[in-house]
Amino acid sequence: DRTIEAVELLQLPAPKFENSDNAFKVFIYTYKPFEQLTTQEKLRALYQHVTLLFIQQDFATNETLRLRFGLGEKKASLISKLVASAKESRLIKNFDPSSESKRYVKYVPVWA
């Protein structure tokens, strides 16, 4: 989790982890603006952000995700679309599915 914290602090693309027979590899990438990240990179960063906050006994929100990606409020729709894609891909879910609020939704990993 220290790696993910450092990556988030610097707003770097999410690291990629690979496990092979004889080695465990971590790929750390240099900074890229949100617009240059691939969909997979965005989803990986979103998932790692949600998971990191969950293990810290906190919740991800649209606001924390905007901060993670270095986006202002004017680009909130980009985060909303990414969240919808992450839910569709079964990476995350709403913490409280019965909540009607769209503005203050809290997200957790789908396995939580």
Language-model regions: role of each:
Residues 1-112:
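C-terminal regulatory or interaction extensions
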